[in-house]
Amino acid sequence: MSQQHTLPVTLSPALSQELLKTVPPPVNTHQEQMKQPTPLPPPCQKVPVELPVEVPSKQEEKHMTAVKGLPEQECEQQQKEPQEQELQQQHWEQHEEYQKAENPEQQLKQEKTQRDQQLNKQLEEEKKLLDQQLDQELVKRDEQLGMKKEQLLELPEQQEGHLKHLEQQEGQLKHPEQQEGQLELPEQQEGQLELPEQQEGQLELPEQQEGQLELPEQQEGQLELPEQQEGQLELPQQQEGQLELSEQQEGQLELSEQQEGQLKHLEHQEGQLEVPEEQMGQLKYLEQQEGQLKHLDQQEKQPELPEQQMGQLKHLEQQEGQPKHLEQQEGQLEQLEEQEGQLKHLEQQEGQLEHLEHQEGQLGLPEQQVLQLKQLEKQQGQPKHLEEEEGQLKHLVQQEGQLKHLVQQEGQLEQQERQVEHLEQQVGQLKHLEEQEGQLKHLEQQQGQLEVPEQQVGQPKNLEQEEKQLELPEQQEGQVKHLEKQEAQLELPEQQVGQPKHLEQQEKHLEHPEQQDGQLKHLEQQEGQLKDLEQQKGQLEQPVFAPAPGQVQDIQPALPTKGEVLLPVEHQQQKQEVQWPPKHK
């Protein structure tokens, strides 16, 4: 009986799944179904009602009777568990497919946001690492600076300790017995006085020589430990060891003196090499001044300038006298430069003095070295004199600036002189043009006088027709046209007077006096030609009367007007020749 009861129970979930598959939910109502709670299957008693009709009635009765005997809770649990799992899986799958189909943009956005977050995290990590590295470097630098400051602060304290040490040694030197005991040198100390091989190698290298002028590493170590030196002073045996070291340092001092001699020789050679460069600069400056003097000489050869320009020329001549003063100043500059070289040499000596003082603080020097130190201190008094010379140098530099300003003023004066010359040339041209205008007016007056009035001629209108027949020959007509052209050329049009461009061109042509002389000669020739042409014109304008064929007419002389007396033709020509020279205003 148990087997018969279990069979219908196992079939019920399969049947319920088939029913769910046959009726799929619509797409639009998917969201509503997600919101609503999932429908649970009916209880076990109603399940056989949904079964098809083909099931026989006997089995239904058996099934109903069997199910009634089971508890309701077990039936619900057995039906709910597999159904809920399957339904949840289906809903998740449908929901994911729907999101993929409708929201591809959201997926892209999500991917981008994820990538951005990852990149931001990486950048933040890198920034943190860099900040840590920078902090570490800053801490190291601060520590180094602190160490340097401490060392610098320790130096004056060490120097004070050395001074105390010197005072103690001087007190010891006052006692002759102690000095004699300390100055006795054993054979080992004499062996140490000899130059070691390392010092000989240092003499060969100039770079190492300069390094030896500075404090050696051993001395720096001694400076850092003043307390140990004070302890050494108390012990006589340790003082003897220090004396041995002092003898070694005396050997080093001798070497340093040799090195100083070599350095002086090198500095002297460098000073000699620097001198030709300065001489080249002076030569260039002198060449420029010579060019300016030549330019001034050329300007003086030109025509005399007005009174204002003469005053400017005098000022320029005064400025020309200044180059001599400049040459003297240049000589002073050279002397000062030599003194600067001496200053540098003294500064080097001061550095050596400081080096020797440090050595004195460590190991008391003998009396000969003390005398040398006094001599060097006397030499230190020279820098005051050199400071005065430096003040003179500054004064000379200021004078050089003033000279440059004067040179600029000379250039401006030259430009003004050129402008004045240009204006004078324009004035001369204007005067020349006015003279030409006066000549033209005078010619027009003469032409008006030469024209014979109709009353004086007294010829009838018939004579005019005869004059037309008796035209001048072709040569005379060509001469008349040539005269008219020359008159037109001599006339000054109004446009020429108002146009400065034409005047500027004329000024360029009239810059040289030789060209002006040639132009004056050319104008004189033109005036002579004009005189000849006017005489020819006067001759051609005299009336020539010829009677027509078959007619004889009495030609009456022209009656003079009131107050006029007729003169023969010769007298009239003489009058014309007398009136020719133009009246200059």
From Swiss-Prot:
Residues 179-261, 361-383, 445-462 have a biased composition (Low complexity). Residues 153-542 are annotated as: 39 X 10 AA approximate tandem repeats of [LP]-[EKG]-[LHVYQEK]-[PLSQE]-[EQDV]-[QHEKRGA]-Q-[EMVQLP]-[GKLE]-[QHVNLD]. Substrate of transglutaminase. Some glutamines and lysines are cross-linked to other involucrin molecules, to other proteins such as keratin, desmoplakin, periplakin and envoplakin, and to lipids like omega-hydroxyceramide. The keyword ATP-binding does not apply. A lipid is attached at residues 79, 118, 133 (Omega-hydroxyceramide glutamate ester). Residues 92-115, 159-178, 262-271, 292-304, 314-328, 341-360, 384-393, 415-424, 431-444, 479-488, 501-535 have a biased composition (Basic and acidic residues). Part of the insoluble cornified cell envelope (CE) of stratified squamous epithelia. This is Involucrin. It comes from Homo sapiens (Human).
